[in-house]
Amino acid sequence: MDNKFLGLTPPMGWNSWNTFTWEINDKLIREAADAMASELKDAGYEYIVIDDCWSEKQRDSNGKLVPDHWKFPEGIKPVADYVHSKGLKFGMYSCAGTHTCGGHPGSFEHEFDDAETFAEWGVDYLKYDYCYKPDYIPGEILYKRMSTALRNCGRDIMFSACNWGNDNVYKWIRESGAHLFRSTGDIQDNWESIKRLALSQIGNECYGGNFCHNDIDMLVVGMHGGSNNEWINSTEQGVNVIADSGETMPKLGGCTDEEYRTHFSLWAIMNSPLMIGCDIRRMTPATKEILTNKDVIAINQDIECRGPYCIKQWNNPDNVFSVSYTHLRAHETRHDL
């Protein structure tokens, strides 16, 4: 299959990691699909993505990935079928290295087998992380390898490359065939993290575009400090470098709704994928209002995929920069962000 429009605009959906980390199961994913179908689908959200720690710690005797039998006792395909029955798309996670960041089997040297497995299960989206990557193989080769495998698996699968902005990813990622690429470390649910990631994009506005979008990481809108991911402070290989500080996470604390609104608007005008990270089963009215703002989403989903303009000016009495992002569209209409 070859959907020539796959990745035309940034994907919109939900990912399990920010709130649930490894605490995922069949019931949770089905409930998330129910919530998206009833509360978010009409706004354009369509992907339900399972992140790390969904599999057993070992492959089977044939080298195939095996779903965790406690978390997904019926396997993955029935979950994917349920998501599809809601008119949504289903996503999963793997890693370019020998293991995932959580210590489960990675896809290194299993790329084509795993791509076929994902296709058999009905996967529509693959997040592909960067932990435990062999030092002797450039990331560019590993992402091209999985991209080739996905393009030959018999199913259209959105390919999300997640190497945290390492290895000059801007220079080669489009040629790899990835539909989106992470250009930052992991976001955390606090204003300092949001601000740091947003400011890190100054000068990088030109790199994303149709069919290869600059991913500034998932949204934390609506989390309000509700997360299970303190474990990332672990010093396991590959894990301790993915927090946005490059070291360990700052203490989680949540944001105000105004800060979340700013966060959502910034991610939208910078054409980042809009992948929700909160518990969408329990959104507050304010959270839903932010995440379904049709004017903000229209900017993000504009098929021209124009990047924002960054305006910097020395105009403060304390001699520091004022930084502003603006986004121009073909027609002049006021939008409340």
Predicted region positions:
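Glycan-recognition surfaces
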Residues: 110, 158-279
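Structural recognition of the beta-strand scaffold that forms the well-ordered cores
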Residues: 11-16, 46-50, 90-93, 124-129, ...
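Conserved small/polar residues in nucleotide/adenosyl-binding loops
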Residues: 326-333
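Mature N-terminal, pre-catalytic/accessory segment of carbohydrate-active enzymes
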Residues: 1-12, 17
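Aromatic-lined carbohydrate-binding/catalytic grooves of carbohydrate-active enzymes
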Residues: 32, 36-135
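Aromatic-lined carbohydrate-recognition surfaces of secreted/lumenal glycan-active proteins
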Residues: 89-103, 152-168
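Catalytic cores of secreted or luminal carbohydrate-active enzymes
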Residues: 265-313
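Active-site-adjacent beta->alpha loops and helix N-cap segments on the catalytic face
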Residues: 76, 136-146
